[in-house]
From Swiss-Prot:
The gene is tolB. GO terms for biological process: cell division; protein import. Gene3D superfamilies: TolB, C-terminal domain, TolB, N-terminal domain. One of its GO terms (cellular component) is periplasmic space. This is Tol-Pal system protein TolB. The Tol-Pal system is composed of five core proteins: the inner membrane proteins TolA, TolQ and TolR, the periplasmic protein TolB and the outer membrane protein Pal. They form a network linking the inner and outer membranes and the peptidoglycan layer. It comes from Rhizobium johnstonii (strain DSM 114642 / LMG 32736 / 3841) (Rhizobium leguminosarum bv. viciae). Part of the Tol-Pal system, which plays a role in outer membrane invagination during cell division and is important for maintaining outer membrane integrity. It is found in: Periplasm. Belongs to the TolB family. SUPFAM superfamilies: TolB, N-terminal domain (SSF52964), Tricorn protease N-terminal domain (SSF69304).
Amino acid sequence: MTKCSFFRAILVAVGLMTAAVFATPANALVTLDIRKGNVQPMPIAVTDFQGDIGAQVSQVIAADLQRSGLFAPINKTAFIEKISNPDAAPRFEDWKVINAQALVTGRVSKEADGRLRAEFRLWDPFAGQQMTGQQFYTQPENWRRVAHIIADAIYKQITGEEGYFDTRVVFVSESGTKQQRKRQLAIMDQDGFNVRMLTDGSDLVLTPRFSPSRQEVTYMSFANQQPRVYLLQLETGQREVVGNFPGMTFSPRFSPDGQKVIMSLQQDANSNIYTMDLRSRTTTRLTSTAAIDTSPSYSPDGARVSFESDRGGKPQIYVMNADGSGQTRISFGDGSYSTPVWSPRGDLIAFTKQAGGKFSIGVMKPDGSGERILTTGFHNEGPTWAPNGRVLMFFRQAAGSGGPQLYSIDLTGYNEQLVKTPTYGSDPAWSPLME
């Protein structure tokens, strides 16, 4: 697959409904209110799609839904009806018997021009209706992405909120021994598949972050033994230094409009937070203290910035206006707080907390209230948000393990999942939804 098709797969979506069923009197269709917090996973039947790779597509869809913690795919051995014609209405009674609250059917076929056509229908067996249906045309190599898009459509139809399955994660791939650890910038699908290396591992890389356009990544590299923030074009592989500062620059992150990069600049024993306009290359200093100010993160509207500072004696989370005014501490619990990152929804700030010899991933409101710990372990760090603000990814170094691994967890704290990668992984950053 070319670099371009990796990020910009051509997809054409067409609505797909069964008129005879859709035209029946509307009953109350099944929904799942995820705003209530911990919910019982909904039993859903995802049938094998028709076609040569249909079973593979449905397997990815079921895996996406199950990993969200909101759905419980029913074992196929329990299915009574074997779907032979996905265009026809299923025998709803057969699916009600096994308590399938929702049913997914579909087909994958190849067009005369070589394109792949994937179609699905989502049914409510208890209402006896089709809920939605679509078909997609794309290149055959993009079949996994189509599966993620279908899973997103199902997620949105039932929960009323955007999904997060058609996304990428950029992270630091770690291989080799602890004494000779090789760290490369890498990118993958959110479920750990389609991993691709972006750097060759000759230089240490840290803290990669996506641009809002998904086409650029900013990160820190020790190229030429000089710590610098770089900007990498994902399609071309071209990279450039963001600014030429006398000290070390680190913890870069884009502004929501993609026009600026905010980062820390270390000079002498302290570091402060700066922004750089990517067009004019002008810099603006936001903090000016004798402390270490780092890990800045914009609110989704770009009006405020959260950051980490030890100005009070140990690392804590602060919030300020985007121009540097109104700097206010918001964390007051036991221990120290670091790596704050604002939710895409704007309602929460995720963080790493160190207390009692352990590291936790938690969330709090932007005013510091409502602190909740989601997971605790020997060493958990680096939370990053899914674009719908419902799930976090982070990395964990277990005691005595060879290296860090990536995990995801939802806001209930109950649905923790290992994200399998071919190497160790750290510093994940979630992309916005693909287009």
